[in-house]
Each structure stands twice: as C-alpha cells, then as structure tokens.
C-alpha cells in the first residue's frame, strides 16, 4: 500500500495535467474512484487544477440513491461542483458505459472541463487484456487501455494506470454488490479466471500488462517505420507486401472508430482495395469506400444526401422530361416505342421521384427494400442519387438506376391497359 504522497511523487513527472486547469473526475463511489477523488482533492493546488465530480446513478441497486446522496453531501462540504445523471433504458454493461461517457462528454462541453479523469489501474488493464483475448480481439487491441487519449473537447486521463489495486490506500467507499454477479464477463474474469491464473503464475497480471506495453511499442514502431507511405495512394499501397498492407489498412481505419468492421468485413475490404476496381462500395453504418484510378478513401454518407427532393406527376396520354429521361404514358400498342417499355395495369397518374427511406419493390414472391437493392447490385453513390422511382396507386412499379430498370411483378390476372415508354435524353 502506498501513501498519496508516494503516488503523487510518481505521477508529477508524467505531467498529465500540464495543459489542464479544470478537470472532471468520474466517481462511482467504489474504492478506486474514491481514492482518485481524495487524491486529486488533496493535490489539486500542487497540480494547479480545479476539480469537479461526475456521478452516474445506474438505479440497479437499493444502495444507489444513498451513494448518490453521500457524494452530493461530500461535494457540498468540500465546495466541489457535482453533476449527476440517472441511467435510463434497458441495462447492460455496454448500455451503461455508453450512457456514462455520453454524460461525461456533455458535462465537459457545457462546463469547460478539458479533461476527464478515471480511476483505472493496472488490475483493470490486465482484466481488459484478458477479456479481449477471450473475445478473440485483434492484436492491436491487446495494447489495452491508454493512460491518455483524446476525449470530447480534451483528454481522458488515467493517472492510476501504472499502480495496482493493492497500492491504493484504504478509504471509505461503497461496495457494489453487482461486482460479484457472474453474469458479467468482467466479473468472471476478476473473480474467477484471474485468481486461478495467478495460482499458476503469481506475476500473471504484471505479465499481461507487459504484453500490453510491448504490443503498444510494436505498433508505434510500425507507424514510425511506415509514416512515409501514403496509405490511400493505390500505387504506394500495392507496392507493399500483403502483411504491411494488412496493418496499413488497420491504421487507416483507426480514423473511423464507429465503423467497427468485423474480421470478415475487414478481409473483404482489403481485397476490394487490392483488386482496385473503381467505384463506390458500401461497408456499413452509412460508410462507403470510394476507389478511383489513383487512390481510395472511406467516407460517411448521410442517407438523406442520397435523395434529391423533386418529383413530377405523369398523367395518362401525356409525356414529360424528368432528369435525363423522356417519359411517355400512352395507350397500349403492338409496337414498342421506347428504349424501355413498361406494361401498366392502371391509368392512374404516375409519380416520378427519388428513393425515400423505407421504399421497397415487390418481385412477386418476395419484396426488397430499394436501399438493399442498391447495395446488393453495387450501384455507385452517383447512380443512387440519380435513381428514379416510379409510383402508381401507392405502389412502386419501377426503379430506374444506372443502366438498369427493375419492374414490379404484376399479378397473374392483371390486364394491361397502357404502357410507359422511357428514352434516355442525349446530351449535347
């Protein structure tokens, strides 16, 4: 066990708070965060900072409200601002974590805190590494938790990360009974797996932390050795060995944290880049990769930007120009008059428009969302933006996209009453 002064002596040279004046402390009420709160309160003058407290009441235990009340009382007694949020929704580890960090971010932005400080220590680091090993995470994610990383409008700082739980002083805190519930993987790792592994190797936790450190150094070295390579330049990228391409692409994807590709999706993406076939390819979560003759880039397209908000009504026995096409809604004829000829079973007006969210077309025994049709057929963003949907009597009767036309499957006993002729207008 260490004293706060000893902890301060080790932390001060790391200059965690050099560029910060107002820092927000995430406090759950457990022994780790209470130690962090007391430590930063005692040494805030020497660190030249002012602190605030952020607490999330998850409302999962009967003690939660009394813990919140205690922290409010402590903050008032010590003249420290405190911010509290009550979790809402269906509880899960991930949902709770997302709620906490969204709350912390909002408080930082609203109240000009430039740093969020959490009480993670080396035992947490070891637990995280083991959990990621169990889940089959990629090598780069075995670097574990970073002591400093960007967050909100500033940084997320973990000053206790080099200390173990046993280094922290005994202090008043609340015991979270849910920490013993084995339905959570972290609790199984902490209470079951790690104790057994430490019986085999008493220094197992130190070994995991050393693994994380060496892994971090390995990837830092890789970045330094490849920083002369422009990853998105197809010529440069394809001059590299397959193994270097693999890690270059992983590095590039670090810039898109919410893309979160699975291993199989990553492999497919790498193959697309290696083939270098020009065009737009959908990835996930509205992300696309665009490949031209010389380079590639990943971009996020907001679905609404795919929609051009204009529409026209085409009446029976009339014609009009819409986008790059000439449409004629005419009585049925034995002769086909247009480049595209669509049989019609109603004389109601036809609405010509862009795709809208939720649009689908019936192909008889099954229907398909038009968005999924675009993805499956690998149409480019430009082709999707210019696609034309024909709607009659509240149903989509055709989709014109790229150089293809997709027709609704008519019922067996429908009687053809008219035809829609479509011709592409020549430019010039």
UniProtKB/Swiss-Prot annotation:
GO cellular component, one term: cytoplasm
Domain of life: Bacteria
SUPFAM superfamilies linked: Adenine nucleotide alpha hydrolases-like
Transmembrane segments annotated in the record for this chain: none
GO molecular function per UniProt: ATP binding; tRNA(Ile)-lysidine synthase activity
Catalytic activity: cytidine(34) in tRNA(Ile2) + L-lysine + ATP = lysidine(34) in tRNA(Ile2) + AMP + diphosphate + H(+)
ATP-binding listed as a keyword: yes
Residues where ATP binds: 28-33
InterPro entries: Lysidine-tRNA-synth_C, Rossmann-like_a/b/a_fold, TilS/TtcA_N, tRNA_Ile_lys_synt, tRNA_Ile_lys_synt_N
Subcellular location: Cytoplasm
GO biological processes: tRNA modification
EC number(s) recorded for this UniProt protein: 6.3.4.19
Keyword terms: ATP-binding, Cytoplasm, Ligase, Nucleotide-binding, tRNA processing
Domain comment as written in the entry: The N-terminal region contains the highly conserved SGGXDS motif, predicted to be a P-loop motif involved in ATP binding.
Role summary: Ligates lysine onto the cytidine present at position 34 of the AUA codon-specific tRNA(Ile) that contains the anticodon CAU, in an ATP-dependent manner. Cytidine is converted to lysidine, thus changing the amino acid specificity of the tRNA from methionine to isoleucine.
The family this protein is said to belong to: Belongs to the tRNA(Ile)-lysidine synthase family.
Protein's UniProt name: tRNA(Ile)-lysidine synthase
Origin species: Streptococcus pyogenes serotype M18 (strain MGAS8232)
Lineage: Bacteria, Bacillati, Bacillota, Bacilli, Lactobacillales
Primary gene name: tilS
């Amino acid at each position: 066990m260490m004293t706060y002064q000893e902890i301060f002596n080790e932390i001060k040279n790391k200059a965690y708070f050099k560029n910060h004046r107002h820092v927000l402390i995430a406090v759950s009420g457990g022994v780790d965060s209470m130690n962090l709160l007391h430590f930063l309160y005692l040494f805030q003058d020497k660190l030249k900072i002012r602190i605030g407290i952020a607490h999330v009441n998850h409302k999962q235990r009967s003690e939660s409200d009394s813990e919140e009340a205690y922290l409010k009382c402590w903050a008032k007694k010590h003249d420290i601002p405190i911010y509290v949020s009550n979790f809402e929704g269906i509880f899960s580890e991930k949902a709770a974590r997302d709620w906490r960090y969204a709350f912390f971010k909002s408080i930082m932005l609203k109240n000009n805190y430039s740093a969020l400080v959490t009480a993670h220590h080396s035992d947490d680091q070891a637990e995280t590494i083991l959990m990621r090993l169990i889940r089959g995470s990629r090598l780069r994610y075995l670097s574990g938790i970073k002591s400093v990383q960007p967050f909100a409008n500033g940084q997320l700082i973990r000053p206790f990360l080099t200390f173990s739980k046993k280094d922290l002083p005994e202090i008043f805190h609340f015991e979270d009974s849910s920490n013993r519930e084995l339905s959570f993987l972290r609790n199984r790792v902490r209470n079951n797996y790690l104790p057994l592994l430490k019986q085999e190797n008493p220094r197992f936790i130190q070994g995991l932390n050393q693994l994380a450190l060496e892994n971090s150094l390995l990837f830092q070295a890789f970045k330094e050795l490849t920083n002369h390579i422009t990853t998105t330049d197809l010529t440069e990228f394809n001059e590299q060995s397959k193994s270097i391409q693999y890690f270059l692409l992983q590095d590039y994807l670090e810039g898109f944290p919410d893309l979160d590709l699975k291993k199989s999706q990553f492999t497919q993406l790498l193959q697309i880049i290696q083939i270098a076939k020009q065009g737009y390819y959908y990835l996930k979560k509205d992300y696309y990769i665009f490949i031209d003759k010389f380079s590639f880039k990943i971009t996020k397209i907001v679905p609404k930007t795919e929609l051009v908000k204009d529409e026209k009504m085409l009446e029976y026995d009339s014609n009009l120009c819409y986008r790059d096409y000439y449409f004629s809604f005419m009585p049925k004829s034995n002769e086909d008059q247009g480049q595209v000829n669509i049989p019609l079973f109603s004389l109601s007006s036809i609405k010509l428009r862009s795709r809208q969210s939720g649009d689908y077309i019936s192909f008889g025994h099954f229907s398909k969302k038009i968005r999924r049709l675009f993805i499956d057929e690998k149409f480019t963003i430009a082709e999707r933006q210019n696609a034309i949907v024909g709607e009659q009597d509240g149903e989509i009767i055709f989709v014109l996209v790229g150089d293809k036309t997709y027709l609704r499957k008519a019922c067996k006993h429908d009687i053809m009453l008219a035809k829609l002729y479509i011709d592409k207008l020549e430019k010039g």
